[in-house]
């Protein structure tokens, strides 16, 4: 996937001041965003990085069905506190299946199916995301070493397979509530997410 840097601006947020940069696929028009702080000068050491896939329901509407919104906000706060880092915000709604299919999957979850089986019942993969654009985005930001903020081993493997130097993993466990506890357990038990024993 060939994406290109197309625009950047300063972005003040309630968590601090960031820079927002947009990358676009010139063929499809698909856009991805890097929200960064402290990268005006090329970093010489490892940088906090989170790969966050778009979640309209969690990020914008504060849905309690997932932990996406709390993860995004906690990462912004962490990066601001540290003074350096980047969130790669990928436009891959619903783990890559799109908003319509995600809501269809939610309806199946309302009937008792877990997040994996709901996708499979729609003849869709449990996780359809790609991460090839991340290397281009990180190269543009001159990030050479990564401390990846994630619980997802697939993201670790994906970045390593792309040749990105991931030197450490930073766990992120926030946002558990009665509505998403089973969802988080499913991510641990069926998607191998790296939660601690006492997270549930």
Curated annotation (Swiss-Prot):
Active site: 127 (proton acceptor), 129 (nucleophile)
GO molecular function: GTP binding; GTP cyclohydrolase II activity; zinc ion binding
Task of the protein: Catalyzes the conversion of GTP to 2,5-diamino-6-ribosylamino-4(3H)-pyrimidinone 5'-phosphate (DARP), formate and pyrophosphate.
Free-text cofactor note: Binds 1 zinc ion per subunit.
Any single Pfam family the record assigns to this protein: GTP_cyclohydro2
Keyword Lipid biosynthesis set for record: no
Example of a GO biological process term: riboflavin biosynthetic process
Pathway membership, UniProt: Cofactor biosynthesis; riboflavin biosynthesis; 5-amino-6-(D-ribitylamino)uracil from GTP: step 1/4
Keywords: GTP-binding, Hydrolase, Metal-binding, Nucleotide-binding, Riboflavin biosynthesis, Zinc
SUPFAM superfamilies: RibA-like
Name the record gives this protein: GTP cyclohydrolase-2
Gene symbol of the encoding locus: ribA
Catalytic activity: GTP + 4 H2O = 2,5-diamino-6-hydroxy-4-(5-phosphoribosylamino)-pyrimidine + formate + 2 phosphate + 3 H(+)
Family: Belongs to the GTP cyclohydrolase II family.
Required cofactor(s): Zn(2+)
Residues reported in the UniProt entry to bind GTP: 50-54, 71, 93-95, 115, 150, 155
